[in-house]
């Protein structure tokens, strides 16, 4: 078991390093440059009156942003997550934690969050578990993950391509829909289903709507591509390495995934992430109908430096969003829905 934990920690450290490599970014497939907002030369409003308040789980939130789930369960993660949570405590951003998979078998792993929760009790956190682990885990154990973290909700992440390429991947997803439906019915928290960079089809989103998930984070192609990351890790496995190259552009982009969701007029909230790099990208997702927008790589890069760098990144994104709103004559986020170029 100890050897398994050591491999887990090394994998997570690899992920941090590889996620920052330009070769593992599907930026050439990023759709945001092909989508525009209508410029308003005479916006009849005062910049300081612009509100970026949104709704999350039927409650108003001051900021519509979340730091997308990134890393947990290893020593390097503690300082990274401390800086992220410290910044969130000052900006009122929400945060998804890295996978809590290790906490299911290692009780000590849960202690990673205790000092962070003690220092930053007001930060809105979301628990996180992979769909493959959901299938085999009792709901009572998942509820403990949420309760221990004092989390607002639970993210279930879906990563089929990553699992196929990852040398240690778990590729048995049989029973995932039944497990997800049971979770939604029995868990005492909102459930968010999230991709990890490959997006969602309309048919999958329709099924998610039918089982009653609270939100879907579309996380489409355009940012960090986990198939490419695992391909680098599988450099000594010629089959997986070649497969990673074959599927280097696999997935549905973030804007198309968001459009797929909007077209259903779903009961779930639509969260946008995947290649979102600035406040203008975020504005375009809000214009499509997203209510929350997530950032991962920009925050990871900043957190590797300092809390101040994370705060600078957050404040810049907020200012960019408000600039997009001012230059389209949008006083509130909903106004952006009328400002998308046809």
From Swiss-Prot:
Subunit (UniProt): Homooctamer. Dimer of tetramers.
Upper lineage: Bacteria, Pseudomonadati, Pseudomonadota, Gammaproteobacteria, Legionellales
Keywords, sorted A to Z: Cytoplasm, Flavoprotein, FMN, Isomerase, Isoprene biosynthesis, Magnesium, Metal-binding, NADP
Organism of provenance: Legionella pneumophila (strain Lens)
Cofactor: FMN; NADPH; Mg(2+)
Chain's role: Involved in the biosynthesis of isoprenoids. Catalyzes the 1,3-allylic rearrangement of the homoallylic substrate isopentenyl (IPP) to its allylic isomer, dimethylallyl diphosphate (DMAPP).
Gene name of the record: fni
Binding sites annotated in the UniProt record for substrate: 11-12, 99-101, 162
Protein name according to UniProt: Isopentenyl-diphosphate delta-isomerase
Residues binding FMN: 68-71, 99, 128, 194, 219, 224, 275-277, 296-297
């Amino acid at each position: 078991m100890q050897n398994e934990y050591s491999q887990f920690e090394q994998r997570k450290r690899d992920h941090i390093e590889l996620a920052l490599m330009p070769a593992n970014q599907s930026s050439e497939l990023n759709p945001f440059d092909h989508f525009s907002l209508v410029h308003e030369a005479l916006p009849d409003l005062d910049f300081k009156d612009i509100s970026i308040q949104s709704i999350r789980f039927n409650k108003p939130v001051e900021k519509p942003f979340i730091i997308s789930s990134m890393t947990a369960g290893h020593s390097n993660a503690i300082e990274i997550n401390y800086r992220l949570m410290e910044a969130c405590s000052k900006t009122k951003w929400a945060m998804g934690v890295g996978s809590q998979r290790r906490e299911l078998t290692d009780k000590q792993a849960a202690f990673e969050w205790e000092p962070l929760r003690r220092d930053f009790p007001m930060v809105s956190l979301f628990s996180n578990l992979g769909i493959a682990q959901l299938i085999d885990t009792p709901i009572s154990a998942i509820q403990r993950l949420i309760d221990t973290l004092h989390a607002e909700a639970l993210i279930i992440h879906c990563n089929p391509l990553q699992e196929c390429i990852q040398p240690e991947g778990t590729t048995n997803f049989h029973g995932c829909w039944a497990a997800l439906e049971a979770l939604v019915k029995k868990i005492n928290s909102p459930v968010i289903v999230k991709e990890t960079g490959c997006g969602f089809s309309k048919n999958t989103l329709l099924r998610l709507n039918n089982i009653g998930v609270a939100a879907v984070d579309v996380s489409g192609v355009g940012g960090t591509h986990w198939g490419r990351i695992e391909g680098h890790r599988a450099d000594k496995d010629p089959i997986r390495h070649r497969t990673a190259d074959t599927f280097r552009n696999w997935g549905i982009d973030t804007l198309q995934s968001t459009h797929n969701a909007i077209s259903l007029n779903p009961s779930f909230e639509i969260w946008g992430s995947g290649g979102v790099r600035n406040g203008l990208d975020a504005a375009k997702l809000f214009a499509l109908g997203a209510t929350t927008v997530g950032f991962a790589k920009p925050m990871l890069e900043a957190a590797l430096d300092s809390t101040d760098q994370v705060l600078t990144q957050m404040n810049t994104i907020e200012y960019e969003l408000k600039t997009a709103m001012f230059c389209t004559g949008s006083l509130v986020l909903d106004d952006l829905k009328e400002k998308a170029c046809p």
